[in-house]
């Protein structure tokens, strides 16, 4: 059974990973809070992560935290030689570069979304945008009111997929008094209630509209996907991996 450490264990996704770990064992968690344990899982401060990874004989780390904490634990994983699955979003360019550096020493899988449905959605979007190359594009995402980064990491990944097919300029939260330009894509983020995650791309042409969307009903789907990625990552060579590699395996 894969021995997993969870970074951000006191958060909602951390709890979801513990709950979803039926074929893996969560042996330790990392958090900056004063909590000693979560569901009988001991909690250690991220600054002590390297020692804890050795003490608890951890096979792989699953991370759903904030960028600063994720980078601290990534350094610990490099020190201890432990693979890491990074689900944290909102990294700046320096943070992403530091993760890339870590992937030269350990297997590191970075994903903005661990849903198989999102993987399929991105492939459908790539085909649709490439085929309907003169259609207007609008991208919308909705998440719970506690999410701090906007647009979501998944929306940013979808935008990357679109820009691989078309040279479009994102317009965030459209406002003002001017017509739409042909080479732009509207990107909108909504924060309300306890929405797990909704993403939709609208492609609009003359007299027809195509909508491609995905809705997560429960955050457990992300936790299960992250654990699948963690099990898959153990034993891999050092390098940078993505969730699509797991889905295609």
Curated annotation (Swiss-Prot):
Alphabetized Pfam families for the sequence: DapB_C, DapB_N
Please give the InterPro entries that the UniProt record associates with this protein: DapB_C, DapB_N, DapB_N_CS, DHDPR_bac, NAD(P)-bd_dom_sf
Alphabetical UniProt keywords: Amino-acid biosynthesis, Cytoplasm, Diaminopimelate biosynthesis, Lysine biosynthesis, NAD, NADP, Oxidoreductase
Entry-linked SUPFAM superfamilies: Glyceraldehyde-3-phosphate dehydrogenase-like, C-terminal domain, NAD(P)-binding Rossmann-fold domains
Task: Identify the domain of life.
Answer: Archaea
Record-given protein name: 4-hydroxy-tetrahydrodipicolinate reductase
Q: What is its EC number?
A: 1.17.1.8
Q: What does this protein do?
A: Catalyzes the conversion of 4-hydroxy-tetrahydrodipicolinate (HTPA) to tetrahydrodipicolinate.
A GO cellular component entry from the record: cytosol
Q: Which PROSITE patterns match?
A: DAPB (PS01298)
Catalyses which reaction(s): (S)-2,3,4,5-tetrahydrodipicolinate + NAD(+) + H2O = (2S,4S)-4-hydroxy-2,3,4,5-tetrahydrodipicolinate + NADH + H(+); (S)-2,3,4,5-tetrahydrodipicolinate + NADP(+) + H2O = (2S,4S)-4-hydroxy-2,3,4,5-tetrahydrodipicolinate + NADPH + H(+)
Q: Which family does it belong to?
A: Belongs to the DapB family.
Where does this protein hold NAD(+)? 8-13, 87-89, 111-114
- Supply one GO molecular-function term: NADP binding
């Amino acid at each position: 059974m894969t021995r997993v450490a969870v970074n951000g264990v006191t958060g909602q996704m951390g709890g979801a990973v513990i709950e979803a770990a039926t074929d893996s064992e969560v042996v330790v968690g990392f958090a900056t809070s004063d909590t000693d344990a979560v569901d009988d899982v001991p909690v250690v401060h991220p600054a002590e992560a390297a020692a804890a990874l050795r003490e608890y004989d951890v096979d792989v780390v699953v991370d759903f935290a904030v960028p600063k904490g994720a980078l601290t634990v990534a350094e610990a994983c490099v020190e201890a030689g432990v693979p890491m699955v990074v689900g944290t979003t909102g990294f700046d360019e320096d943070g992403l570069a530091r993760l890339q550096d870590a992937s030269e020493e350990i297997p590191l899988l970075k994903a903005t979304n661990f849903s198989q449905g999102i993987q399929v959605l991105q492939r459908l979007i790539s085909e649709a945008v490439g085929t309907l190359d003169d259609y207007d594009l609008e991208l919308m995402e909705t998440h719970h009111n506690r999410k701090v980064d906007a647009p979501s990491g998944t929306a940013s990944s979808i935008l990357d997929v679109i820009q691989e097919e078309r040279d479009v300029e994102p317009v965030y939260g459209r406002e003002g008094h001017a017509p739409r330009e042909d080479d732009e894509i509207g990107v909108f983020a909504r924060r309300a209630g306890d929405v797990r995650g909704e993403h939709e791309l609208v492609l609009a042409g003359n007299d027809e509209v195509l909508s491609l969307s995905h809705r997560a009903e429960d955050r457990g789907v992300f936790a299960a996907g992250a654990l699948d990625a963690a099990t898959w990552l153990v034993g891999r060579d050092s390098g940078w991996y993505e969730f699509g590699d797991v889905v295609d395996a």
